[in-house]
Amino acid sequence: MSDNWVVQNLQNALDTWNSKLAEIWQILTQSPENFKGGGIWQVIVQIHGALQAIGYALLVLFFVVGVVKTCGSFTEVKRPEHALKIFIRFAIAKGVVTYGLELMMALFNIVQGVTSTIMKTAGFGSTEDTVLPDEIIKAVEDCGFFESIPLWAVTLIGGLFITVLSFIMIMSVYGRFFRLYLYTAIAPIPLSSFAGEPSQNIGKSFLKSYAAVCLEGAIVVLACIIFSLFAESPPVVDPDAAAVTMVWSYIGELIFNMLVLVGAVKMSDRVVREMIGL
């Protein structure tokens, strides 16, 4: 690495960005069971198991309310076809509550398969690192003390922007993982609503929302791939321009590309919800 302070500051900001991008790539290919050593998942599974008791109680409640609202009289309940329909609904709802964790992990694994297919098709095993062009390093190193003063200001502003954007992006990806945990922990309660016909929309909405959170990972991977292709063709640097102009032009275009990626990551939940009509 160069001994120049301006170059070091810019390179440190880019290193932060590259490390966060690599961390995102690693998180998106991980299962909730293995995330952070699996300690969080064990607690979530325990909470899920404890809430199953409440889920079974609500299952009976939703079932009774559903029978009362859908049947005009007790005579209808005694009809074989109607009784069979009610029994099948209750059995399915109980199965969904009992095996809710397995159902949700199956959904997650399907989406992970989609994400892996996108990565393999695009030919990306990891993200491309963003590096400082040699022309800028040489121009900055050739600057005198007074010429480098405006460069310090430009570098500080640019480095701060890049660092802030990298943390905003990683927070969005971590937020998705936390939502996966929240959905998994509380799943028995909304899934119990399948026992009653009037309340079944609660369960449907819950599963749709969970699927949307899972699909966010695929959207984020697509955004990272597009940004990596941008990074392969870095901003054009005019070698005849002044050092300050070169740095300012490079940082401006780079931050614009980064803003596009951060915006895509932040809006991934909205994009998915529009896709599946939530």
Where are the regions a protein language model picked out?
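Alpha-helical transmembrane segments
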Residues: L191-K208, D240, V271-G277
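Hydrophobic alpha-helical transmembrane segments
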Residues: A53-V65, I157-T163, L180
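Short amphipathic alpha-helical coupling elements at transmembrane boundaries
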Residues: E23-Q26, H82-R89, N109, S116, ...
